[in-house]
Regions:
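Short beta-strand/loop segments at the ligand-binding rim of alpha/beta enzyme cores
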Residues: 43-53, 94-105, 152-163
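Glycine-rich phosphate-binding active-site loops on the catalytic face of alpha/beta enzymes
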Residues: 1-8, 72, 76-78, 83, ...
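Catalytic cores of alpha/beta
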Residues: 109-119, 161, 165-181
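Surface-exposed amphipathic alpha-helices with a cationic face
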Residues: 36-41, 70, 91-95, 145-155, ...
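Short, electropositive alpha-helical surface patch
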Residues: 50-72, 177-185
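Active-site-adjacent beta->alpha loops and helix N-cap segments on the catalytic face
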Residues: 5-17, 24-37, 57-64, 79-96, ...
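Expand to "…catalyze enediolate/carbanion chemistry for C-C bond making/breaking, isomerization
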Residues: 129, 153, 166-168, 172-174, ...
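Non-catalytic positions within long, well-ordered alpha-helices that form the structural scaffold/packing
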Residues: 70-71, 118, 152, 175
Length: 224
């Protein structure tokens, strides 16, 4: 569940514009947690991860955010601009509510750095498949297969791959080497098209169809 931010430096055009639309309607981090709580009322089992940037969480206060996130039914966060060296206070707050601190690794993360990334991480490791922003380019599974294997070995955590995955075919290829696949921009683009055309009912239809495509493709994969 994406939390909008004014300076989303890791995101491509689609998610940047989505964030601007949300901010134009005065959407706050507290509103994002309210949305999580509404979802949790209907679904008590699907994990909820809030993804965004550190500044809004810092402004709310790590302890206050951790408490509010827990009460909303959130299971963890991905704060893409908060490095391991600076998240000690956050981890302390999260530990009180068993919230996961999900960290990121990239194709340029070497093994010694991976050990630091893995230290204190929980939930899963988010592996950025391309050097760039969200929605940019296409990921090459063969190019990162060795990185994924190393990340699993060093971290002891499940590794999910994101950035550059938009179709069922791409998701299936990534599922062969990873424990999960993260797709964001492709879903947001359905919302953008609906916003531009005024066909607001089209957004959930398009997102639902994409979710089925991705899920069906991944379920055909047999791990070696």
């Amino acid at each position: 569940l994406g939390a909008p931010f004014t300076d989303p430096m890791a995101d491509g055009a689609s998610i940047q514009k989505a964030g601007l639309r949300a901010l134009a309607h005065h959407t706050t981090l507290a509103d994002t947690l309210k949305l999580a709580a509404r979802f949790r009322e209907q679904d008590q089992t699907t994990p909820i991860i809030v993804m965004g940037y550190a500044n809004p969480v810092f402004r709310m206060g790590y302890a206050e955010f951790a408490k509010a996130a827990h009460e909303a039914g959130v299971d963890g966060t991905i704060l893409v601009d908060l490095p391991p060296e600076e998240d000690g206070e956050l981890r302390e707050a999260y530990a009180q509510y068993d919230l996961s601190v999900i960290r990121l690794a990239t194709p340029t993360t070497h093994e010694n750095r991976m050990k630091k990334v893995a230290e204190g991480a929980s939930g899963f490791l988010y592996f950025v498949a391309v050097t760039g922003v969200t929605g940019a380019g296409s990921a090459d599974p063969q190019a990162i297969a060795g990185n994924i294997e190393m990340a699993k070995r060093v971290s002891g955590l499940p590794v999910c791959v994101g950035f550059g995955v938009k179709t069922g075919v791409q998701a299936a290829e990534m599922a062969k080497i990873a424990d999960g696949v993260v797709v964001g921009s492709a879903f947001v683009e359905h919302a953008e098209k609906a916003h531009e055309s005024g066909d607001f009912a089209g957004a959930p239809r398009g997102m639902g169809a994409l979710a089925k495509e991705l899920s069906s493709a991944i379920r055909t994969i047999t791990k070696p």
